[in-house]
Amino acid sequence: MDSGTSVVSISADILRPPVLTAAQTFGDNENECRVRLVLTAQQVQEWNLLPQDIQQEILKNGQVRVETYSSSNTARKIFICTSSVSNLASSIPALIKVVTPTKEEDASLNINLAVSSLILGSKVLIHQNLIPSLFSVSNSTKLLYSASLLPRSSERLVTLETNEIDASVVIETLLKYILSRISFIPRVSVVPYIPDAAYGIYGSPSTFTQFNHMSSMVTPENPYGIPPIALTSAGGNPDPLRTTQVFPHSGPSIPLNIAATQVVSQKMSVPSSLLDQLYHAMPHKLMEISQNTNANITVEESDSNSNEKFISVVGTSEANQSALMQLYAALISLGRK
């Protein structure tokens, strides 16, 4: 049979990620769950080259539905897999196996998922509940998760390192753990990760309104969980937001020794109402930050009815990082008064 794809492409507003409930993002029962697989471009290509009958066999002849976001990102893709827990537990390892070239002696699988930090739970909860549960079904399985949030989202990258034999029961254990968490917090807000090529945008109104300024994950020094390397590589990398300990930094980027003096552009996306509050409370704040950091700061013209504005910051990577830190601190401080 000819090669093809059983994946349905869906549209998404990449600059304004939706805010969903935990139940909307993942599901709330074992009969229908949504798992968000994070795949590399090579893995997607391998999937698309598979004959249609093999794809259908892996997806249990339509019992497992797969959707992906339409985007120009060439580095990462999200496969949203929807089915029962039992179907997903067998289909996901099979899918990862066929799209990941491995040596014969290497029977391990790395399964990458995007999962909300709040659904996943605290480090204490993970170590007291999830990891012992995984270890009880497979003592060779490792659970890794990204130190910071995926770009413009409230999700982390979660990686399961397991062997082919145990992969299905490991996935089933993880999915049941997530369902048990959602039963307690079904309406908690989630900003899902949508891979895109709009890498110059720093944050979004969705994340701005969802992240509490007291959260240890998001601070003025690291707004939205994006590390400073995002600025130094903002010139040519299609996916420069190096927010994970698992994925390697791929694609061209500005060498750090050049980035120190090279001028780069960044945009900070903020709610219009919040920027209006800043103008009212501190009318000269943007000029003050610009002078303090030696970065050029302007507010782009936008539709008067838009609920979003873009603050453009132009300067060296160091100047931009300092300016964005101060902008974030000024904006978030308005919510404390």
From Swiss-Prot:
The keyword Protein biosynthesis does not apply. Keywords: Cytoplasm, mRNA processing, mRNA splicing, Nucleus, Ribonucleoprotein, RNA-binding, Spliceosome. It is found in: Cytoplasm; Nucleus. GO terms for molecular function: mRNA binding. One of its GO terms (biological process) is regulation of RNA metabolic process. Residues 263-327 form the KH domain. The keyword Ribonucleoprotein applies. One of its GO terms (cellular component) is nucleus. Component of the U1 snRNP particle, a subcomplex of the spliceosome. Component of the U1 snRNP particle, which recognizes and binds the 5'-splice site of pre-mRNA. Together with other non-snRNP factors, U1 snRNP forms the spliceosomal commitment complex, that targets pre-mRNA to the splicing pathway. This is U1 snRNP-associated protein usp108. It comes from Schizosaccharomyces pombe (strain 972 / ATCC 24843) (Fission yeast). The gene is usp108.
